[in-house]
Amino acid sequence: AFVGCGGADCGICGRDSLIESGLDLLQLVDLGYGACKFIEAEPSWRAGQAERNYARRGSLRVATKYPRIASAWYASRGVVADIVSLHGNIELGPIVGMTDRIVDITATGATLRENDLVITGEIMECTARFFVNPGAARLDPRVRILGERLAAAVEHLHFEPVAGSAQ
């Protein structure tokens, strides 16, 4: 929000946060670390129930803390989804029967396994990004130079994936 509203010229955060913010920001460099995947998941013991609920209700109920990304993904697939915005422990949505599925990020899959959830769809991969305010990119050469230097540094680095991570 600081960068999008002009309080800062540039920043670093995950691709997921940039997309979900909906702000007009320029992603200049994929920093290549902090890898995770955006996934759709459901309880393993309720396999097929979401499709039956969709046929009966005409919509899929989905818990997420990323409503913009989830809505866009379902819309791109022609699926009507009722998005339930939750903050923290979204995996409980389908476990307690409040939703059919979840959309969330995962790096190792540990939380999914702990809650007996299985991946039913992969939405996108995310890594940390260097991003800038478009106005700052046009007006301040230091912002562009910083982006160029980061891009050059990333080319020479090699991040080893953490065991069990999304990479």
What are these regions (language model features)?
Residues 1-167:
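Domain-level signature for soluble enzymes in the chorismate/prephenate branch of the shikimate pathway
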